[in-house]
Regions:
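Juxtamembrane boundary at the C-terminal end of a transmembrane helix
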Residues: 125-137
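Transmembrane alpha-helical segments in integral membrane proteins
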Residues: 46, 89-104
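Alpha-helical transmembrane segments and their helix-start/interface "positive-inside/aromatic belt" motifs
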Residues: 26-41, 110-117
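Hydrophobic alpha-helical transmembrane segments
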Residues: 78-90
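N-terminal juxtamembrane cytosolic/stromal segments of multi-pass membrane proteins
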Residues: 1-30
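Active-site and channel-lining beta-strand-loop segments
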Residues: 53-81
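Cytoplasmic juxtamembrane regions at transmembrane-helix boundaries
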Residues: 99-122
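Hydrophobic alpha-helical membrane-insertion segments
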Residues: 35-49, 120-123
């Protein structure tokens, strides 16, 4: 049993070393640094806007979705506003993990995935802003 534990720890140590090497290799490409800085700034803006909406609401329920044709589609608790920035963070993490697997193949894929994450976070900021407008204007 001791050898099995030793092997598992050895594989975990090697996996951690490979992961660190892959992250450092990916961060060596300067556009990745710029993309990640912009992504984390946009996601921080997302979280701040969600906090502002949460703090501004004086009741327990908030309109979370509005359709022009049908009107209000979704009403929920105020804490559900934090789903929006969480989705942005999930997109950033998933795309970064995908980049760790394809980092050596193509620079185009790096720009595509991180650009998509930027676009998603911009749309999520617009979504939080629209939730604010629906509830307070």
């Amino acid at each position: 049993m001791a050898t099995l534990d030793h092997k598992i720890l050895h594989y975990l140590y090697l996996g951690r070393a490979r992961l660190a090497e892959a992250v450092l290799d990916l961060l060596g490409f300067w556009p990745v640094k710029i993309y990640l800085a912009l992504l984390f700034i946009l996601n921080a803006i997302n979280w701040l806007l969600a906090y502002f909406v949460n703090r501004s609401v004086s009741q327990n329920l908030v309109v979370l979705h509005y359709n022009v044709n049908l009107g209000v589609n979704l009403i929920g608790p105020v804490a559900d506003i934090y789903i929006i920035p969480t989705l942005g963070l999930i997109f950033i993490i998933i795309n970064f993990l995908l980049l760790l697997n394809i980092r050596a193949r193509s620079n185009f894929l790096i720009h595509l995935l991180l650009g998509f994450s930027l676009l998603v976070n911009l749309f999520l900021i617009a979504a939080i802003f629209s939730v604010y407008l629906i509830n307070f204007r």
